[in-house]
């Protein structure tokens, strides 16, 4: 529980007034990444539910998307912008890493943030218009499960950085544990809270495979650029994985079936 509280305080702006001290093995809290996502998902769902009572679906979709940014303090959206500024500057590795540390927003950063947020709003709008707000609960959870792969048997090209707390530290047992409890939470909520049929559960679980495949391809692409992973890339991976999840859900559940 101590490590879960620590990682929740680290990755979100949820006001938790608990002093649980320092943990010399803080890296082990990475196993709770999906659980942090689950908390974010529940909060986003509740905010979405209230928003839909007060506003039209389009406004509610904007509020839901904004909620995800505010709950995390913009931590991951900042990583998205920094990553796109650096990786698509088409400079050498050292220059890319330097650009990634620069707090100023470039054109690539602004475009990436704008398009990702707009696409999220669009897909969330379609999803909630189909009376499927429950889908939002699993988006942050599955995205953070996927991004754990970016910390599995990886290296970082930087000597310092927040991402160094986790990159290369994930063990096989930690990954398996996270996968198992994620599957259980998705199954329990889908079947026993929302009483959805088995076919819907199978489709939602399929999003985990899709996100994993995306992250593997994303990691290969990043390695070609800077020979490793940084904290910004972890944040970028979360934002893009959430978008991939929404696209998958929209195409598989609402468009083709």
From Swiss-Prot:
Q: In which pathway does it act?
A: Cofactor biosynthesis; adenosylcobalamin biosynthesis; adenosylcobalamin from cob(II)yrinate a,c-diamide: step 7/7
Q: What class of enzyme is it?
A: transferase
UniProt record, GO biological process: cobalamin biosynthetic process
Q: Which UniProt keywords apply?
A: Cell membrane, Cobalamin biosynthesis, Magnesium, Membrane, Transferase, Transmembrane, Transmembrane helix
Q: Name one GO molecular function term.
A: adenosylcobinamide-GDP ribazoletransferase activity
The prosthetic group or cofactor this protein requires is:
Mg(2+)
| GO CC annotations, alphabetized | plasma membrane
InterPro entries to which the protein is assigned, alphabetical: CobS
Query: Which parts pass through the membrane?
Result: 30-50, 52-72, 109-129, 132-152, 175-195, 198-218, 237-257
Subcellular location field? Cell membrane
Reaction equation(s) it catalyzes:
alpha-ribazole + adenosylcob(III)inamide-GDP = adenosylcob(III)alamin + GMP + H(+); alpha-ribazole 5'-phosphate + adenosylcob(III)inamide-GDP = adenosylcob(III)alamin 5'-phosphate + GMP + H(+)
Which Enzyme Commission number(s) are listed?
Answer: 2.7.8.26
How the protein sits in the membrane? Multi-pass membrane protein
Query: What PANTHER family has UniProt attached to this entry?
Result: ADENOSYLCOBINAMIDE-GDP RIBAZOLETRANSFERASE
Which family does the record claim for this protein?
Belongs to the CobS family.
Question: What does this chain do?
Answer: Joins adenosylcobinamide-GDP and alpha-ribazole to generate adenosylcobalamin (Ado-cobalamin). Also synthesizes adenosylcobalamin 5'-phosphate from adenosylcobinamide-GDP and alpha-ribazole 5'-phosphate.
Task: State the name under which the record lists this protein.
Answer: Adenosylcobinamide-GDP ribazoletransferase
Q: Which organism is it from?
A: Clostridioides difficile (strain 630)
């Amino acid at each position: 529980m101590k490590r879960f509280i620590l990682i929740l305080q680290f990755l979100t702006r949820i006001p938790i007034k608990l002093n649980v001290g320092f943990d010399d093995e803080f890296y082990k809290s990475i196993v709770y990444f999906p659980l942090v996502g689950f908390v974010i998902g529940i909060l986003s769902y509740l905010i979405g539910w209230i928003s839909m009572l007060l506003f039209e679906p389009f406004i509610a979709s904007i509020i839901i998307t904004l909620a995800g940014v505010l709950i995390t303090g913009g931590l991951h959206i900042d990583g998205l912008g920094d990553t796109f500024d650096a990786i698509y500057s088409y400079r050498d590795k050292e220059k890319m890493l330097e650009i990634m540390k620069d707090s100023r927003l470039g054109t690539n950063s602004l475009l990436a943030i704008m398009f990702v947020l707009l696409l999220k709003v669009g897909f969330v709008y379609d999803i909630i218009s189909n009376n499927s707000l429950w889908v939002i609960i699993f988006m942050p959870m599955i995205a953070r499960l996927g991004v754990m792969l970016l910390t599995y048997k990886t290296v970082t090209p930087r000597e310092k950085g927040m991402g160094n707390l986790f990159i290369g530290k994930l063990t096989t047992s930690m990954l398996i544990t996270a996968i198992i409890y994620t599957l259980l939470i998705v199954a329990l909520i889908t079947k026993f809270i929302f009483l959805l049929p088995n076919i819907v559960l199978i489709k939602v679980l399929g999003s985990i495979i899709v996100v994993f495949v995306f992250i593997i391809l994303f990691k290969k692409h990043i390695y070609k650029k800077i020979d490793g992973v940084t904290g910004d890339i972890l944040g970028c991976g979360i934002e893009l994985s959430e978008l991939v999840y929404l696209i998958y859900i929209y195409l598989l559940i609402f468009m083709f079936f």
